[in-house]
Amino acid sequence: FLTLPEEQQMLFEKIAKRTDNIVTVVISGRPLDLRRISEKSKAVIMAWRPGTMGAEAITDLVYGITNPSGKLAVSIPWCVGQVPISYWDIKTGHVLTADNLENRFTSRYMDIPNTPLYPFGFGLSYTGFDISDVEVRMGQDKRVHVHCNVSNTGNVAGAEVVQCYYETSVSYTHLRA
């Protein structure tokens, strides 16, 4: 199941009827359909599998003792139907450009957004950060080197995850399992 168990959903609804000041902590090993939870929560913390010190770490986040700096390693779907069963697509060489954005998907939902509720790499903080002077170069070792400056623009101490992604536009090799 990609939703919360019915008992937990019922408990959440009872709490939501009494207050709108809700911070939801989700402890799960996979992305869930959290749309209803997200709509009624001031914040959602994806704690995943936090381990033995998880309660203390989560408490520090909720009370502002520690500044959150994590980013999602998966997308949180808008609805269960957005979760693919498999992803075996081969890159076709049809590069996504500003001219063909509408044709990126061959089928789409008509009644909900075609985007996730929270995308891969999403994460909030109690402060802001500015990433500047980004420099990308290929080294003599044939590795890509990325350098940048990160500045905290807020009043709260924090750490930022600098996200850098690479994708080939054409697959030259089809790997078989």
Model-flagged regions — what are they?
Residues 1-176:
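C-terminal non-catalytic regions of proteins with extracellular/luminal or membrane-system context
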